[in-house]
């Protein structure tokens, strides 16, 4: 029986398989998750401003998303600024105010 309530179960299972996590990594503050369809989420934490972050898993191209948050180094800081630029498929460059740490996450497709 390959149907269930009008659904082709083989098609449904094949669709769900692409969301399976096939590889993970976690060491210190660096991590990644790779899904069967090539989707990759990776992130980490950086403590210096004005540096290039190299991805553990290179993306297919620059069509990925980066999100980030700043952690103040001192309680007297009253505002934050984060600039992400110079995107390549293997890295990105960021700047922020001195004394802050960056927690970042990138999401996109890698070549399998």
Question: Could you tell me what each predicted segment is?
Answer:
Residues 1-22:
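A signal for long, low-complexity, Ser/Thr/Asn-enriched, surface-exposed stalk/shaft
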Residues 27, 32-112:
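Extracellular attachment/recognition segments
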């Amino acid at each position: 029986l390959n149907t269930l309530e009008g659904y082709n179960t083989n098609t449904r299972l094949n669709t769900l398989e692409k969301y399976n996590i096939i590889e993970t990594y976690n060491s210190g503050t660096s991590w990644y998750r790779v899904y069967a369809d090539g989707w990759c989420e990776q992130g980490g934490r950086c403590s210096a401003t004005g540096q290039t972050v190299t991805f553990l898993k290179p993306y297919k191209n620059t069509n990925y998303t980066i999100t980030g948050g700043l952690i103040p180094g001192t309680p007297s800081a009253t505002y934050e600024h984060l600039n992400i630029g110079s995107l390549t498929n293997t890295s990105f460059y960021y700047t922020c105010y001195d004394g802050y740490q960056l927690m970042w996450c990138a999401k996109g497709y890698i070549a399998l």
